[in-house]
Amino acid sequence: MSDLQKSFAKSKLAKLPPEPPPIPESVADEDDDSGSSTETVTPSPVKQLFARPGGTRGFFDQELYLQRRVNDLDIVHHVYLTSPTNSGPLFVMHHGAGSSGLSFANCAAEIRKILPNAGILSADARDHGSTSVKRASEDGEADPETARLDLSLDTLNQDLLFVIRETQAKMGWETLPDIVLVGHSLGGAVITDVAKKGELGGKLLAYAVLDVVEGSAMDALQSMETYLSTRPSRFPSLPSGIEWHTRSRTIRNRTSARVSVPSLLYHEDVPKDPSKPWVWRTNLAETKPFWEGWFVGLSRKFLEARGGKLLLLAGTDRLDKELMIGQMQGKYQLQVFPDAGHFIQEDQPARTAQILVDFYKRNDRSALVLPPKVADMQASAAMKKGAGAGVPLGKAEGGTTGSFKRS
């Protein structure tokens, strides 16, 4: 990225609203500089007092559980929803691997502050959050045996389309609202795939991808296993899990972490380690067979899909060659968050929301006032000229259009 682009991005960010102040702590973060090492971060008893779960009220109006049978699987998709009003748009959010729909909770609330008629749909992907996938037995009952993990891009694409259409049916919407797709990390790959295949038709206004680029994503996969081996596999309590996310700077906003992290962990009924009964809902190591398929061809699809395009990045040097060329050609909007971590929408929800709302307004077709057609302008001019001359319109003798005969 050029120095000009960097300075432009910083100037744009300076105009955005400030983030709310973090939750105060009684103990200073004197060891924050060590937060980049996820292996050495351990929760402290004092800080756990400030890492309590924050709840989900106030972020979405309701939760839906959408049942679906796919071959031998019974799937219940869990959806957080605030319906649009007065012809407002619907922002459809898709989280990243290992996360949940609550990753967008604070951002959703900020969007509604700026654009009160907007709707927000944020679903838990299969095998994430409260979305369940179980094998169905011959008698139609759920089989306790664990279903085979399938997080391929095609599967996640179809899941998202089902959630959108089933939500429409459940809520009794005659037609879908205008849609803005928003995806973080893996979610960015999913919404780009949906946009490229055009299955939402003209209802898709635009799509926004948060902090994922094909080139850097493919490079990062090489070190993913090392990262997963360094993070804790279990926690003594839910507050300690929240604190790990903030101390390691995985999520840099404590308010966001208190809302989103509880959906990432669950308490084992019979813990393998009774001193640490809280474990991850999604085993990211088991998703390895799908990693490459998520991101191959992402940049090309992002540039080729129809609709407005927005790319939000946490760093200034993550563009691959295709995206650099596309940026120079003005094919998409780029925003850089130099002070955010990977979870842009959680670290800086107010700024993310402002950019998303501005992006929607820029692509809102209902707000466009098209210039009159040339033919209409010519016809109008001819009518005015004829009226000014005081000559009645009619047909020449012989029934064909021509000069008019005065009586």
From Swiss-Prot:
Pfam families: Abhydrolase_6 (PF12697)
SUPFAM superfamilies with a match to the protein in the record: alpha/beta-Hydrolases (SSF53474)
Active site residues per record: S185, D211, H342
Keyword tags: Hydrolase, Serine esterase
Enzyme class: hydrolase
Entry's EC annotation: 3.1.1.89
Catalytic activity line of the entry: [phosphatase 2A protein]-C-terminal L-leucine methyl ester + H2O = [phosphatase 2A protein]-C-terminal L-leucine + methanol + H(+)
Gly residues bias locations: 388-401
Function description: Demethylates proteins that have been reversibly carboxymethylated. Demethylates the phosphatase PP2A catalytic subunit.
Family under the similarity heading: Belongs to the AB hydrolase superfamily.
Protein name as annotated: Protein phosphatase methylesterase 1
Taxonomic source organism: Emericella nidulans (strain FGSC A4 / ATCC 38163 / CBS 112.46 / NRRL 194 / M139)
Classification lineage: Eukaryota, Fungi, Dikarya, Ascomycota, Pezizomycotina
Gene: ppe1
